[in-house]
Design a protein with these regions (language model features):
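Extended recognition/assembly regions associated with phosphoester-bond processing machinery
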Residues: 3-22, 41, 54, 161-165, ...
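A general structural motif
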Residues: 23, 55-57, 88-90, 170, ...
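Active-site neighborhood of phospho(di)ester-bond hydrolases with catalytic His/Asp-centered motifs
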Residues: 29-30, 61-64, 92-96, 210-216, ...
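Short, glycine/acidic-enriched loop or turn micro-motifs at the edges of active sites
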Residues: 33-34, 68, 100, 179, ...
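Acidic, His/Gly-enriched loop-helix segments that form or flank divalent-metal centers
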Residues: 124-125, 129, 133-229, 233-239, ...
């Protein structure tokens, strides 16, 4: 009788590590924020890796926030808009809150002062436009918006207007900001996908997939069993991060260049060399799959 009441437990299987399908290589790139100087070498390194990869499906996901804060928003948009011409790669360009703000400004110029509070002024300067000196002058902002619409090429506007909100590959879900806990990933609101922060970051509730995101900056990659954050504050730190996923293996690739000096504006002439190095350095590391919060140099 006792043996029937107290049956021995079956051994508990180790948790299955997240993966992408066999034959697939996925790259995700964090928030660029106008740092074309960091984006170019990272794209070159990713393209070289994909050329050599033994894969039948090659995916690259940019997580949004391409503009603002850094010195060359225009150059970044132009570069990304041209990538779709590269064949044999599945490109996904996600919409960040900064792209939403720029599009909102084009539709409603009265939002200009608010947009410029978090870096929109640098985006406008990259297009050769001056921010109105009197923030409350509606007609001045309307002229700037009209000038920006005139300057943007058809390819650039098409790029901005067709940005995606999310994409899933295997056990991974990619969005700009994260996702709202307790809501299925396929039912997330656009607002949360572009803007959510603390409700996502502070929750211990998991999702159907591991969420790969940007939006919330940190000087190091943030990784645990439910999310991987790869916004390394490129506009200030001079470090732009790429995440590579193949099978169950995850690794990091970072381009490192000049960083913004304390107390300076975002203009390119005010960037300082990082660690005394000139130019841009590409560094690699891997994320330990048994301890996803640890990035291991390699």
């Amino acid at each position: 009788m006792l043996s029937k009441l107290f049956r021995s437990r079956a051994p508990v299987a180790a948790p299955t590590l997240p993966a992408v399908p066999e034959g697939t290589v996925v790259w995700a790139v964090g928030d660029v924020h106008g740092r074309l100087d960091l984006l170019e070498p990272l794209i070159d390194a990713i393209m070289a890796d994909l050329r050599d990869a033994a894969a039948t499906r090659r995916v690259v996901v940019f997580l949004g926030d391409y503009i603002d804060r850094g010195p060359d928003s225009r150059g970044v948009i132009r570069r990304l808009a041209g990538l779709s011409q590269v064949q044999d790669i599945e490109w996904h360009f996600l919409k960040g809150n900064h792209e939403q703000a720029m599009l909102g400004f084009l539709q409603n110029p009265s939002t200009g002062p608010k947009w410029c509070e978090y870096g929109g002024d640098n985006a406008l300067r990259s297009y050769g436009l001056r921010v109105p000196e009197l923030a409350h002058r509606a007609e001045a902002w309307a002229r700037v918006a009209a000038d920006l619409r005139h300057i943007l090429t058809e390819a650039e506007m098409d790029f901005l207007e067709t940005l995606e909100l999310s994409v899933s590959v295997g056990d991974y879900f990619f969005s700009h900001a994260g996702a709202r806990p307790g809501v299925a990933l396929n039912r997330q609101s656009p607002e949360d996908l572009m803007w959510i922060r603390q409700p996502f970051l502070d929750s211990a509730v998991g999702f159907e997939r591991v969420v790969v995101h940007g939006h919330t900056p940190a000087r190091t990659v943030q990784a645990d069993s439910r999310r991987i954050g790869i916004d390394t504050k490129a506009y200030e730190t001079g470090v732009l991060t790429g995440l590579r996923i193949q099978g169950r293996e995850r690794s990091l690739l970072q381009s490192s260049g000049p960083q913004r000096g304390p107390g300076t504006r975002y203009g390119g002439e005010e960037y300082l060399p990082v660690d005394g190095e000139q130019g841009v350095v590409v560094r690699a590391a891997r994320i330990d799959p048994q301890d996803p919060g640890v990035a291991v140099g390699g």
